[in-house]
Amino acid sequence: MKLTRDFPHNDTMAQWQPSDHKDAKVVGELFAHFGAEHFTVQTTRTGVPVVWLPRELLQDVVGFLRKLPAPFVMLYDLSATDERLRSHRDGLPQSDFTVFYHLISIDRNADVMLKVALAESDLHLPTITNHFPNANWYEREVWDLMGITFDGHPHLTRIMMPKSWQGHPLRKDYPARATEFDPFMLDAAKQDMEQENLLFKPEEWGLARGNENEDYMFLNLGPNHPSAHGAFRLVLQLDGEEVRNCVPDIGYHHRGAEKMGERQSWHSYIPYTDRVEYLGGVMNNLPYVLAVEKLAGIKVPQRVDMIRVMMAELFRIQSHLLFLGTYIQDVGAMTPVFFTFTDRQHIYTIIEAITGARMHPAWFRIGGVAHDLPKGWQRLVQDNLLSWLPKRLMDYEKAAMRNSILRGRTIGVAAYTTEQALAWGTTGAGLRATGLNFDVRKWRPYSGYEQFDFEVPVGSNGDAYDRATVRIEEIRQSMRIIEQCMNNMPEGPFKADHPLTTPPPKERTLQHIETLINHFLQVSWGPVMPAAESFQMIEATKGINSYYLTSDGSTMSYRTRIRTPSFAHLQQIPSVIKGSMVSDLIVYLGSIDFVMSDVDR
């Protein structure tokens, strides 16, 4: 493993002002190759070019972007929006449903978002799984939740909802509250049908039941298996102990997080973000509030930025400690997990003193944080973290990471290359373990990360061992960042002085009756955000997490798209583990570091 300091910092990614990005290089390349008349470039607050194109050009455009001199090698996200009730669409192509494709070029450190408009009477698009293998699950999700068909898809079936589910939940005409449904009844016939739907049929997935000499065993790992790390089912095609193939089955933890965003105010949705990746705490608040602040045009004080960075890094450390303990436990050592949980308690002592809560503080606010840092917070950080954890990390490395059994179980196991990681949309430590130092905090700084001195650890083999060593070193780098926050915390307010800061600063509410009325409306009804689209990605605990928000000039989001890293990471499993032993699969699952709430949302 090595530490890297040189990064292709992209200043344009930090700009949130409305822009059509027509001057972006990729837009010029598309115009030159296909003709400008085929495209509509949209003005947004996303910070990336957003280009509408006709359905007939989708395959050609995606293939063209894949083959450019500095190609767009990662399909970062793919989803859709039901446009039928949207009011503010001036200058955009007529569309009932819009499918969007978010592509990333590592060489350019640049993105482009492609949009295709569809009429309700013809909801068909060609699959792009021939260009990006990870489009498979994203297209299944769009069909499941929006009802859009992708012609040529290898297996277009439900992925979040049960097979028997009726309707497509993210459509605007689909109920958003449980009280809008008929009462749920489960009679014997329906129970039998649901049990039958859970039966795995290999032929449906193109898997053989055996060869001319022997039959394969099909084994369910999960959805209630301790090594599955949550409600996750993995159907294994086994030849003895060898995994010939496998089919991940997700959706058991799906809660409709994106649908909830359409019926909560911009402010009241913050607690829901905590629970998208339930180990990340305020790390989950960060991309959401940053995206909302882009919509509102809020620039927060420097003190707010530094407080947010410090709290995010505290949650990164406690998440990585949990990973370390459970990962070593998966390999077979039982003791370290008790030590890592003890160390996490030290982190929670700091978090609880600052926020008043532990795992789910919901502490970040639109325009700031809930309240200022308490007196004596520096001593808490010093005693419970900076004076404690460095020695513990050395103990973990000596006792566990240098242990011959752990090394034998993990080195060379579940390895993949940088190219394979990018093709499957892998981010975070899973990508950096292959040798690529792509860290959003360095490449696309947000919340003032460009002011901090820290390094990005990378591996070289892309195996289960490197993924663990990268995270251990990331803990050290997070401590460096936190120490800089402690030593350089600026004075100033903990909220921005802006009309859309929610809740508004107290001094704005105690002047006369109008200020009290505005305060009442903003807190009870919710702030009204300008009609626009915004996007924000961050380097979260498991990889890159982002929110893509669409405002229609209301108190609630018109569309809340949550892109989580774990969804992409689980889709990669079959390509990595084929030909390995079942014991290697357990090691691989532990090295991914995922929670199912992050996958299923």
Swiss-Prot record:
GO MF terms, alphabetically ordered: NAD binding; NADH dehydrogenase (ubiquinone) activity; NADH:ubiquinone reductase (non-electrogenic) activity; quinone binding
Location(s) in or outside the cell: Cell inner membrane
Region listing for NADH dehydrogenase I subunit D, in residue ranges: 215-601
Protein name, UniProt field: NADH-quinone oxidoreductase subunit C/D
Gene responsible for this protein: nuoC
InterPro entries assigned: NADH_DH_suC (IPR010218), NADH_DH_suCD (IPR023062), NADH_Q_OxRdtase_suD (IPR001135), NADH_quin_OxRdtase_su_C/D-like (IPR037232), NADH_UbQ_OxRdtase_30kDa_su (IPR001268), NADH_UbQ_OxRdtase_49kDa_CS (IPR014029), NDH1_su_D/H (IPR022885), NiFe-Hase_large (IPR029014)
Taxonomic superkingdom: Bacteria
Subunit structure comment from the entry: NDH-1 is composed of 13 different subunits. Subunits NuoB, CD, E, F, and G constitute the peripheral sector of the complex.
Keyword rRNA-binding: no
One GO cellular component term noted in the UniProt record for this chain: plasma membrane
Pfam families xref list: Complex1_30kDa (PF00329), Complex1_49kDa (PF00346)
Reaction(s) this enzyme catalyzes, per UniProt: a quinone + NADH + 5 H(+)(in) = a quinol + NAD(+) + 4 H(+)(out)
Topology with respect to the bilayer: Peripheral membrane protein
Family: In the N-terminal section; belongs to the complex I 30 kDa subunit family. In the C-terminal section; belongs to the complex I 49 kDa subunit family.
Annotated function: NDH-1 shuttles electrons from NADH, via FMN and iron-sulfur (Fe-S) centers, to quinones in the respiratory chain. The immediate electron acceptor for the enzyme in this species is believed to be ubiquinone. Couples the redox reaction to proton translocation (for every two electrons transferred, four hydrogen ions are translocated across the cytoplasmic membrane), and thus conserves the redox energy in a proton gradient.
Entry's EC annotation: 7.1.1.-
Enzyme class per UniProt: translocase
Keywords, sorted A to Z: Cell inner membrane, Cell membrane, Membrane, Multifunctional enzyme, NAD, Quinone, Translocase, Transport, Ubiquinone
Predominant place of localization: membrane
